[in-house]
């Protein structure tokens, strides 16, 4: 799973990042690849109830990449974080396949409630730099969320969300 996912990530990066030169440079130089690789290991350990070890790996990865992904989060295939510094992905977040996000994105909760408290993000979603998607909300497939938007409500599939708070518009 991990290595097939890296291959899919590399292909997604090549398609969407004009600065990507070749597979080797992507694997060695893109913090997103490193963060997601170690997230997969931490998530595996978390599922084995080795919570301390999972969180330790998560925190060490955050130190080296600037990307914080809780090992309890669920992330699909082909996930890409472009310029990942400052990304935070909460414990009960679910991210489906082929999602792209930029630096400074938070997929977080709104308080200290228990249970499902973070967003569920559909497939083929793009989340702009600095966006905050907060609470146990549903983001549909093929959604684009604008930079610095604050999303506090569900977004149906095939929409665009922009602003503070985000206004949902039809995709063109």
Briefly describe each language-model feature range.
Residues 114:
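Catalytic-pocket segment enriched in acidic/His residues
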Residues 1-65:
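Terminal amphipathic alpha-helical/low-complexity segments used for targeting or macromolecular assembly
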Residues 65, 70-71, 76-77, 82-91, ...:
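Left-handed beta-helix
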């Amino acid at each position: 799973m991990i290595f097939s996912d890296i291959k899919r990530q590399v292909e997604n990066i090549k398609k969407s990042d004009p600065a990507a030169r070749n597979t080797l440079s992507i694997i060695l130089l893109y913090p997103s690849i490193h963060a997601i690789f170690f997230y997969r290991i931490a998530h595996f350990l978390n599922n084995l109830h080795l919570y301390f070890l999972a969180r330790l790996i998560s925190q060490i990865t955050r130190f080296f990449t600037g990307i914080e992904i809780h090992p309890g989060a669920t992330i699909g295939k082909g996930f890409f974080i472009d310029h990942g510094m400052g990304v935070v992905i909460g414990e009960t977040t679910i991210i489906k396949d082929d999602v792209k996000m930029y630096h400074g994105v938070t997929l977080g909760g709104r308080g200290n409630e228990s249970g499902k408290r973070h967003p569920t993000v559909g497939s083929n979603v793009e989340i702009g730099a600095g966006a905050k998607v907060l609470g146990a909300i549903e983001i549909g497939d093929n959604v684009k969320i604008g930079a610095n938007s604050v999303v506090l409500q569900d977004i149906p599939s095939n929409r665009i969300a922009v602003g503070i708070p985000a206004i949902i518009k039809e995709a063109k």
